Amino acid sequence: MKIAFFTETFLPKVDGIVTRLTKTIEFLTKNGDEVIVFCPEGCPDSYKGATIVGVAAMPLPLYPELKLGLPGPAVSDKLEEFKPDLVHVVNPAVLGLGGIWLAKTNNIPLIASYHTHLPKYLEHYGMGMLEPLLWELLKAAHNQALLNLCTSTAMVNELEDKGIQRTALWQRGVDTENFRPELRSEKMREKLFGKYQNTDSLLIYVGRLSAEKQIERIKPVLDLSL
């Protein structure tokens, strides 16, 4: 199968979306599928056998880490040359909307996936009044797809409540070779505890430090457990 991805987030950026995409691409190419990825410029030319096509992009004003790709005629030409059997749009934004339009106009089956909870970002950055409008835009985009993949059951339920149709859960995978109880290390625990007393409980947060992550919500739980 030949699969075309449209994503606003890709290498060299590292986050949960990129990790999921790179693992998916690696699995697909390993099993004989052909993959092309359209993403913001600054990316590598290839990854694990997949062709990567960078497009001109601009940073999102409220969130400069995220670049919005600007699809042009070259994207259409490259897609026509590749002749995909399936288009997968990741978090439809500017580049993603271009992917949706190209899939629809060329009668290519389309799926989409929802990763970044953009409506909640507006709330954290003082623009909550725009949340209803953004939901309407997301609904219009996602309802073009034959299938909308969500990364949690909570998001499946919320998207359905907002009128987004044909949702399904895209569960996370765990590499059991790298993450298993047998690899427990007392030396690593001591390093992580540092100057603090080594107790039975060790909580680790792995992720970005940003307002929308709401890391502060864990403090009341920690206070109750101490």
Question: Each predicted region: which residue ranges?
Answer:
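A short helix/loop element that forms part of the nucleotide-sugar donor recognition site in Leloir-type
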Residues: 180-196
